[in-house]
Amino acid sequence: MEVMDHHHHTSSTRPNPTTRRMNFFLPNAIHMDSHLLYYRPQPGYGAPPPQGGYGYPQPPPPQQPYGYSQPPPQQYGGYNGVPPNAPQYGRPGMPSVNSNAYINGNQNAPPPPPQGMHSFGQGAPQNYAFQYSNCTGRRKALLIGINYFGQRGQLRGCINDVKNMSSYLHENFGYQRDDMVILTDDQQNPMSQPTKQNILRAMHWLVKDARPNDSLFFHYSGHGGQTKDLDGDEEDGYDEVIYPVDFRQVGHIVDDEMHRIMVQPLQPGVRLTAIFDSCHSGTALDLPYVYSTQGVLKEPNLAKEAGQGLLGVISSYSQGDMSGVASNLMGFFKKATTGDDAYNKTLATKTSPADVVMWSGSKDDQTSADATIAAQATGAMSWAFITAMKKNPQQSYVQLLNSIRDELATKYTQKPQLSCSHPLSMVPPLLL
């Protein structure tokens, strides 16, 4: 069994983390949370994990949600294609974090993001580019927290993570409650339960009708794991997955599907910020550029992808040339069937003309932690992100990455990881 080594502090000022997720190896190359999965929907995936769980008695779900006003998701209108009434972003008299302090004379604040289209860099075709979002448009958020009440591997902090994150977005970045879909397993409305069907439907709602300079926010706190990679796009041979509350009946959600739903449809200049507080979440959105506080961990070979014709698909899409998309795809799949080694796994590029940024609290070979902080169960990444942002909301990507690392280092052995759909400029501020 492979278990992450968390430091256990005895000081009253520090939490005593418990391992939120543990990894063990099963036949057929499945890695998952040992406390969670005592059986799978499909037979034959190995023996059950140890009995007992975490040792924290968990009361049944309360009869009412947390107490903040939350209409059920089906009332948002987004699922049926009818957008809610346009909200007033920000409260009167309250400056938004996005009213950039650099423009207002604070030279210590990072400058605003560069405008226009930007090249992916060396090896990319000339017309292949992406665009940053200035986050001045519409805001929508999808927040998912699953404690798995009554199931083996029950967690304590995931619903608290969502409550804290939604309040932070609302109070500091002008996200309106009516533009948030919150799926947690303490809610009585079946449409607000984090089932696989509801999660997938909400992912489609999140990105529907997104326009340049819109800001979309996705937050997942719950169990994560790995499964055998079937399409050859993962270096370690495994796809990352998340587990809906009903995964035992209907299965998990794979990173390839999350990328297809939430990343591929986005136009240039649309921001999607994602936070995953789960194990094996480092590449949960299948983004091609991965950074740590030590530097670049992973980046695509654009020259190779361009030579294979992969980048033509997305450049045609970003220019609205759907016929170009079709012809590029046909040419790609034709080459893929010729036996050419370059196409033997039918790989598609994971870059995007949009502005997609993902924060995760662990590398794919680490676990995440479920700890008690200020007498409240919470996930490490969710807590560290909010704590670091509250201390200094005007940070660049690299500053925030280091700030989150410093927060985590006080209580955890985890390291933060930042993944992007495009090469990361360390200069632009993090806008939400």
Swiss-Prot record:
Active site positions, chain numbering: 223, 279
Residue stretches of biased makeup (Basic residues): 1-11
Gene Ontology BP terms: apoptotic process; proteolysis
Stretches for region Disordered: 1-21, 41-87
EC number from the UniProt entry: 3.4.22.-
Coiled-coil intervals: none
Keywords on record: Apoptosis, Hydrolase, Protease, Thiol protease, Zymogen
Record field: compositional bias (Pro residues): 46-74
Enzyme class per UniProt: hydrolase
Pfam families cross-referenced by the UniProt entry: Peptidase_C14 (PF00656)
Sequence ranges of Low complexity compositional bias: 12-21
A molecular function GO annotation: cysteine-type endopeptidase activity
InterPro entries listed in its UniProt record: Caspase-like_dom_sf, Metacaspase, Pept_C14_caspase
One Gene Ontology CC term in the entry: cytoplasm
Function according to Swiss-Prot or TrEMBL: Involved in cell death (apoptosis).
Family: Belongs to the peptidase C14B family.
Protein known as: Metacaspase-1
Organism: Sclerotinia sclerotiorum (strain ATCC 18683 / 1980 / Ss-1) (White mold)
